[in-house]
Amino acid sequence: MSIRSVIVHDLSQAQTATAQAIALGAPLELRSPPDGAAILGPAVFKAIADDLAQTHPGAASTMILDCGTNAGLAMAALRQGCKDICVDVPTETRAKIAAMAHAQSARLHGPVEIALDLAAAADSRTFNKQSRMKALLEQFLRGDARDD
């Protein structure tokens, strides 16, 4: 089973996605929304990652903070302790950020082509959003669907 990328916007979504992945035995990569470093902030994203590490210690999921094109936010994320970031900057700048990441045992990631964005479930007008989110996650993690 290949690793699946799920975009989470808050702690509740991250917890639900992680729990579903564990239940299905599916590898999971959690990502912030595009430009998540500017939207959530590195400290909030790190707090979500820390919470998951405590509440789901057996989960081997990666939490990737998208820093967009902002090198400053990428460096701030690394200083905050984020271990996985995505940043779209020129090659020379990327090399400098990569060196900083390597020194902190962090990793740079590229963009992802296919991901389930849980905003679709959060924006749903259905009565039970949690059930809809779980159903979308199960379908996606099993490989039965693409981004809805």
Model-inferred region functions:
Residues 40, 73-75, 119-121:
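Short, solvent-exposed polar/charged micro-motifs at secondary-structure junctions
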